[in-house]
Amino acid sequence: GNVSAGTSDFAMVVVDHKLNVHEEIDMVTTPAGKPVAMVHCNNCTSDLNAWVNLFKEYQELLGIPVNMDEIYSKLYNIALTGDTDCGGLLSYNYISGEPVTGFADGRPLFVRSANDKFNLANFMRTHLYASVGVLKIGNDILFNEEKIKVDRITGHGGLFRTKGVGQRILAAAINSPISVMETAGEGGAWGIALLGSYLVNNKKGQSLADFLDESVF
């Protein structure tokens, strides 16, 4: 399977048996025609990105040169040092409505009690987990109710641009091993390029699946 995670996110898992009907799950196919269960979520990193931009404005206010890749790297990595329970902090990252959880409109919300452990590491960890929270709900249906087994899940998209962080957050959220390639941050454009390469470079009669296994992965 694979997970694309950026401003929105989705998981696509190739399945080998017929599933029950779930409002949270869409059935699609691979380019080769294999059945795929898809969990699509409207909200992923948009709310987190808004907070990162706030930190960028503060850095600009101090007169410090801004490098967005460095800001993301520092903030994402500090999240790994946070408490496992995020210090009790909660984030609801719904910039827009979320059909998976039945919300028609978005109202992003950050919540803490007076005694929660409110620091930067826990703050960032909270928002990273919130980014994949709805995705976890859909994947729990696939893994726990439908008993889907996955060989591997490949992550791609902006969440994985900072090496190791998004990968670990997602692995913990959906309790599955996540592999990430060097091209993870390229997103859909890289997949389109692969399809183009297949059309040009496949051996006579070679299926797309065989081409990907033998020449790409």
Question: Model regions: which residues?
Answer:
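Active-site core segments that coordinate phosphate-bearing ligands/cofactors
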Residues: 1-154, 159-217
